[in-house]
Amino acid sequence: MWELEWTPQAEIQYYDILSYWVEHNGSNSYSMKIMKEVEKSEDLLMYNPFIGQEHYLSSPYTKIRRLLVLKHFSIIYRITDKVEILSFWDNRYDPKKLASLIL
C-alpha cells in the first residue's frame, strides 16, 4: 500500500470546491457526495496508483496522472516514493490555469 499525501494547495482547492457547492445548493448533500467519491479514489490510489491516466502535462521527468471523480472533478497527482496529490481540479476550469498551478 502506498502512502498518500495532499499538498496544501490541493487541500485548499478541495475545501474551496466543497464550500462552493454548500453555498450554491444551500445544502451539503452534493459536497458529501464529492467527499465520498474522493475517499473511494484515495483508496484506489493507495492500492493502485497507476490506475490514473497519464496527464498531458507529463514530461519524461515528471509523470503527472489524473483520476476522474464524478465526471466534473479530477485528482491530479504524481508518484514518487508516495502518491502526492497536486491538485483537486474542477474540469470546467480553464486548463491553462492548471498548468500554471502544478508546473
Predicted regions and their residues:
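Enriched for short, Lys/Arg-rich terminal
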Residues: 69-103
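Basic/aromatic recognition patch in beta-strand/loop cores that engages polyanionic ligands
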Residues: 51-81
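Basic, Lys/Arg-enriched alpha-helical interface segments
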Residues: 1-63, 103
